[in-house]
């Protein structure tokens, strides 16, 4: 009844107006699953490869080759197989591709099929996706890491760090968490506007004011949390995504906005100062993706009291994560389905992290769609944290709205991760 009878891929547009792959998978019993694939702006060198067409069409960013791969080669290989055999099908597609980084068929082709298969199988079993993937224990609603000020590759301003996030750990449930975040977001907009700053929003819905430094951005956020009626370091904490690979040049960290260049040790100390001065409980990509020594220094400095998230460092890859665990670097992994390119490998990365006592943060990309799969996956994996942008742009809100629905579906079973994510 759950045999795959048809797969249809198409080229659609993401939130940045760039093409991406959408896949529909049909099963023998009439069930259908649909998934759209996200795309990143700051991508790690070790990520699985998106297949793009090149040429003039869409300025080289078309995905007709990936769509063609799904509709022909991938369907020919997996048509007729049982959609409930997720791991087997994912492994077949990886073997069919035959490259270490999915560059022949494209991670965007393989992932679209992988996610759509899970959604079709969930529909066939009469279960919501979070329950189908996560089983009976999937009930933990994640703390949202809401990206309200943008810099770096996500903004045209002098701020070197890419994201400044708020984490409403003091909320009682996801609905309250979203409300708290929304109130701080709108308060920040007023504060920025009153000081003459631009309040247009970036790719992920955050503001991109012309501030010179990370402390200047953090001061605005502290003020906005308080003015919205919350206590920084009690109701609401802060997270950073430095995306420091983007400004790591010739072995040094070049903070152009702040007008200084730091050696790895000094960069780690600068981040430690910020963690000690502000209620920062999470720092993502504080050091560059191949600066393992710098990562070790940072982990030794603040790893006992701050979540240190590897994004470009680990690229949702279990093998790289195991290397990091052995070396004692970082204590958390950012999970982006399109960095690794299949559902089963994504779930494996989360499991590897949890077994080693590392946390996992489910994440969107800067190029998103209305697809809300990651909301279900955050609950399915009980990872306790989700990063899906600000409180603006429907491509971000689709995920928050889905979490609100899931909480309602779970009823009294639902638990909100809240303060359980705090370290030390």
Curated annotation (Swiss-Prot):
Coiled coil: none annotated. Its main location: cytoplasm. Its EC number is 4.2.1.11. Binds a second Mg(2+) ion via substrate during catalysis. Mg(2+) binds at residues 241, 284, 311. One of its GO terms (cellular component) is extracellular region. Its cofactor is Mg(2+). Keywords: Cytoplasm, Glycolysis, Lyase, Magnesium, Metal-binding, Secreted. (2R)-2-phosphoglycerate binds at residues 162, 336, 365-366, 387. It is found in: Cytoplasm; Secreted; Cell surface. It comes from the Bacteria. It is an enzyme of class 4 (lyase). One of its GO terms (biological process) is glycolytic process. The active site is at 204 (proton donor), 336 (proton acceptor). It catalyses: (2R)-2-phosphoglycerate = phosphoenolpyruvate + H2O. GO terms for molecular function: magnesium ion binding; phosphopyruvate hydratase activity. Pathway: Carbohydrate degradation; glycolysis; pyruvate from D-glyceraldehyde 3-phosphate: step 4/5. Pfam families: Enolase_C, Enolase_N. SMART domains: Enolase_C (SM01192), Enolase_N (SM01193). The keyword Lyase applies. InterPro entries: Enolase (IPR000941), Enolase-like_C_sf (IPR036849), Enolase-like_N (IPR029017), Enolase_C (IPR020810), Enolase_CS (IPR020809), Enolase_N (IPR020811). PANTHER family: ENOLASE. Belongs to the enolase family. Catalyzes the reversible conversion of 2-phosphoglycerate (2-PG) into phosphoenolpyruvate (PEP). It is essential for the degradation of carbohydrates via glycolysis. This is Enolase. It comes from Agrobacterium fabrum (strain C58 / ATCC 33970). The lineage of its organism: Bacteria, Pseudomonadati, Pseudomonadota, Alphaproteobacteria, Hyphomicrobiales.
């Amino acid at each position: 009844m759950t045999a795959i009878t048809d797969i249809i891929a198409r080229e659609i547009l993401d939130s940045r107006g760039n093409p991406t792959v959408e896949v529909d998978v049909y099963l023998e019993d009439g069930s259908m699953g649909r998934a759209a694939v996200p795309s990143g702006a700051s991508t790690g060198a070790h990520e699985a490869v998106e297949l793009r067409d090149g040429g003039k069409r869409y300025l080289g960013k078309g995905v007709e080759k990936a769509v063609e791969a799904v509709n022909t080669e991938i369907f020919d290989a997996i048509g007729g197989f049982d959609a409930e055999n997720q791991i087997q099908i994912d492994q077949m597609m990886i073997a069919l591709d035959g490259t270490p980084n999915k560059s022949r068929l494209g991670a965007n082709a393989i992932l679209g099929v992988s996610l759509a298969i899970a959604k079709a199988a969930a529909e066939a079993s009469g279960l919501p996706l979070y329950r189908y993937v996560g089983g009976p224990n999937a009930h933990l609603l994640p703390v949202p890491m809401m990206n309200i000020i943008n810099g770096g590759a996500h903004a045209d301003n002098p701020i070197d760090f890419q994201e400044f996030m708020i984490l409403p750990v003091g909320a009682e449930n996801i609905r309250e968490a979203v409300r708290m975040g929304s109130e701080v977001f709108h308060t920040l907009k007023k504060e920025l506007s009153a000081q003459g700053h631009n309040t247009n929003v970036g790719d992920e819905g955050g503001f991109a004011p012309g501030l010179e430094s990370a402390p200047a951005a953090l001061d605005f956020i502290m003020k906005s949390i308080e003015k919205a009626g919350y206590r920084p370091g009690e109701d609401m904490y802060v997270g950073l995504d430095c995306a420091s690979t983007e400004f790591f040049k010739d072995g040094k960290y070049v903070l152009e906005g702040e007008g200084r260049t730091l050696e790895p040790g000094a960069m780690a100390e600068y981040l430690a100062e910020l963690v000690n001065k502000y209620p920062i409980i999470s720092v993502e990509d504080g050091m560059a993706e191949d600066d393992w020594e710098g990562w070790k220094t940072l982990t030794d400095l603040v790893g006992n009291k701050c979540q240190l998230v590897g994004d470009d460092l680990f690229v949702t890859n279990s093998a790289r994560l195991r290397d990091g665990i052995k070396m004692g670097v970082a204590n958390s992994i950012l999970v982006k389905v399109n960095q690794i390119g299949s559902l089963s490998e994504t779930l494996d990365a989360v499991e590897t992290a949890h077994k080693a006592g590392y946390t996992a943060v489910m994440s969107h990309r800067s190029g998103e769609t209305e697809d809300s799969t990651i909301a279900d996956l955050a609950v399915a994996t009980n990872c306790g944290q989700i990063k899906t942008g600000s409180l603006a742009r429907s491509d971000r809100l689709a995920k928050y709205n889905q979490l609100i629905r899931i909480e309602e579906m779970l009823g009294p079973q639902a638990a909100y991760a809240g303060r359980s994510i705090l370290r030390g």
